[in-house]
């Protein structure tokens, strides 16, 4: 390989090819903006220092999405360890720094209070926040999100049991643009339920205040259009609060809400004129049959 007389081309074999190292920063940013975040991590950032620095540009770091990465791997109990959380925290803080406060979307799992508070204090334009499976995120950092990120329009706090109904009040009061809320819980253990990868002691902290959360949602989050509350413990009374308060709902996911009947759902949602899709609980779950051997029957003993 030889460089051809200062013409910005590299001679390889029998042909001449552009010398990509000569591209201006503006050209690099234009090219890299067409790649996903993960594509930049495994490609351009490894080519040269110049390309890596371009990938650090704030305009390329307004969205931090690890959700697709998590989905590409099977669930692991190791994700629930402090060591793994430290790695996720470090990653989030580095992206916050690169964005220079310009982050608008965060989709992450297994972060902690430390990195989320760091993001809340530096990213006032945050609009989308997914923090699923974050046992060490509590009301303290969610209060910072509510106070510092008033433009929040989409929030996913599924399976994060350290976040209580108190956060829903604070977020509802401060984030008037909130349109999407996902507060899904993990299925409780049972023979017909999917396998759950999580520490048993964490599963025991399952939130049991479904009606309280439902009343708060109906009172403070009246602009919601999309609501997911899978496996909530709410009853017909709680669903009534949600439907009366959130009259603009277009989508509801009530899977696993075993305290609701078909009649409860039909009655309470009948007034939601904009509702286009509702996912209901399974009203006919499979029943585990226990076979008890009869004394004296050799085929069953």
Curated annotation (Swiss-Prot):
Pfam family, one: F-box
Name of encoding gene: FBL19
Claim: Repeat is one of the keywords in the record: yes
UniProt-recorded name of the protein: Putative F-box/LRR-repeat protein 19
Keyword presence, Repeat: yes
Chain positions of LRR repeats: 108-133, 134-159, 160-185, 231-256, 257-282
Ranges where the F-box domain occurs: 18-66
Swiss-Prot/TrEMBL keywords: Leucine-rich repeat, Repeat
Positions of disulphide bridges: none
Coiled coil, from the record: none
